[in-house]
Amino acid sequence: MSAENTPADSPKPSRQALDAWFTPLRFGIGLAIALVVAFPDVVFGSGAFFHQDYGVLGYPVIHHHHHSFWSGDPIPLWNPYSNCGAPFMAQWGTMTLYPFSLFYLLLPLPWSLGVFCLIHLWLGGMGMYRLAHRRVDLRFAATLAGLIFVFNGFTLSCIQWPNYMIALGWLPWVALTVERACERGGRAIAIAAVVATLQMLSGVPEFIFMTWVIVVALQAVAIIEKRDRSFALLAGRRLAATVLLVTGLSAAQLLPFFELLSLSQRHNGFAAEKWAMPWHGVGNFFVPLFHCAKTYTGTFFQWGQSLIATYYLGLGAMTLATIGAFRGRTKETTALAGIAILSVILAMGENGYLYGLIKDLFPRLGFVRYPIKFLMPLVFVTPLLAAHGARWFMNRKPPLAA
């Protein structure tokens, strides 16, 4: 869904010159520099990520894969070092079939895994830049969107899970390419299927499911705006074709996973209520460490929820997103705002009541552990709404001189 500025809504010449400076190349270079500045030890090899699940889950899994790869077993099916032994490739989250895992398999650990995570952060920022620019047609606003998507509490908290970085890194690209596939068909469907398959191989089923909910919602808005029955039918067929292709391309990973799931201890109510956002957690959107406790390692976690260290998005980002929702009123911004509100309510788990109601209607939702993960859609829509807010600021007329 693209947007073009009409002459009446276009920024002033000085603002146009500023906007023209923020090209994709400059944004990409700037984002890369920002990540290097934020994590110099990881980039230059003098340090490594280690906190929480990165050290006790993520790195050991990758180390086993790395060791197996160099021992002549590039696709290990079994991990003898996990408890008394456990399936490896079938666990999905081990990223065994993710093609770009070759980066950390061929290069030395732990440096390669840390840089691998940062590369996917960069990838996600670039994807959000392209997606936002397609909507608001302003490079400066798209730049803000890309930065907000990368540098927020939720995204940075997810660094401890390398497979989460893959899912988040490809998220904007899935939305962008599937949107184009529904509009253009043909080769665009194949491109969307490949991109979505890359995210599918990350092994984060909750994020993948929510990605497709967002994609379908945005496509529904596009169909409503066009008011063209033939386009609706065509877009629906193209979307279905994309989903079928993704399913086929991912079958080598999905079939073993579902067999493992059927034999595992995971059930509809497995840890369903653990780590939901408490009522006071709303304050964390405005104050980074609201109701947080300091651990012995010097990090902070929220009372009642210790999966995500912080989901603070930044007051500036939230202000722009609010302006985008109320000032740039379109069907899409209304839908994005609705997704944001729904995301927060579901993240509260039973505290928000709606989660329990939906789980009663769809018991399979109980397989999703930790309701706090439902904040992912909020992290996706906030940069887009902020881009709409920035567009409103850039296009508004200056006040009359006294």
Give the positions of each predicted feature.
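Periplasmic/ER-lumenal interhelical loops and adjacent helix-loop junctions
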Residues: V56-L77, T242-G324, K359, P363, ...
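Membrane-embedded helix bundles of polyisoprenyl
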Residues: L31-A34, L123-I224, R238-F257
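Transmembrane alpha-helices and membrane-interface helical segments
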Residues: M126-R130, R134, W173-R180, V215-I223, ...
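Hydrophobic alpha-helical membrane-interfacial segments at the cytosolic entry of transmembrane helices
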Residues: R26-A32, F231-F258, A272, A337-L342, ...
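Membrane-interface helix-loop-helix junctions at transmembrane boundaries of multi-pass membrane enzymes
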Residues: K226-R237, T310, L320-Y353, P399-A402
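Active-site lumenal/periplasmic loops and adjacent helix-entry segments of GT-C-fold
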Residues: V42-R135, F140-W170, H280-L307
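Membrane-helix boundary/interfacial segments in multi-pass membrane proteins
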Residues: C158-M165, T299-A309, G338, L342-V381, ...
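Start-transfer (signal-anchor) and selected internal transmembrane alpha helices
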Residues: M1-D41, L234-R238
